Amino acid sequence: MPTTYYTDDHEWIEVEDDTATIGITKHAAEQLGEVVFIELQPEGETFVKGDEIGVVESVKAASDIFAPVTGEILEANAALVETPAELNEDPEGNSWLYKIKLSDPGELSELLDAEGYAALIG
């Protein structure tokens, strides 16, 4: 069964075995407003925790996406790049950004659980 974690940067990461799906939270999507552009890295790219791995631009602001963990991109959500406004419709579901292979599962212990994230956003 997948386990979901959250970051201080308003990203979620759903982990099952050594694979994780990454996206931005509903709270972040609401704060951004209507998303008009998304830039994602290609499959096969590797990154370390904290690296910039994408950009989400809205009518209000641009926001960098930072890697919540170290890994390799298995899949980028190409459909979301084509229709960025979909991110506002289902940010914590079908509008995920990446599927990745985890390099260091130990990094997950540094992330927030649902209760911790709820406390963060008040």
From Swiss-Prot:
Family listed: Belongs to the GcvH family.
Chain positions found as N6-lipoyllysine: K60
Domain Lipoyl-binding as annotated: residue spans: 19-101
Keyword Transferase in record: no
Job of this protein: The glycine cleavage system catalyzes the degradation of glycine. The H protein shuttles the methylamine group of glycine from the P protein to the T protein.
Protein name in the entry: Glycine cleavage system H protein
UniProt keywords, alphabetically: Lipoyl
Assembly behavior: The glycine cleavage system is composed of four proteins: P, T, L and H.
Database matches in SUPFAM superfamilies: Single hybrid motif
Originating species: Dinoroseobacter shibae (strain DSM 16493 / NCIMB 14021 / DFL 12)
Cofactor: (R)-lipoate
Gene Ontology BP term (one): glycine decarboxylation via glycine cleavage system
Note accompanying the cofactor annotation: Binds 1 lipoyl cofactor covalently.
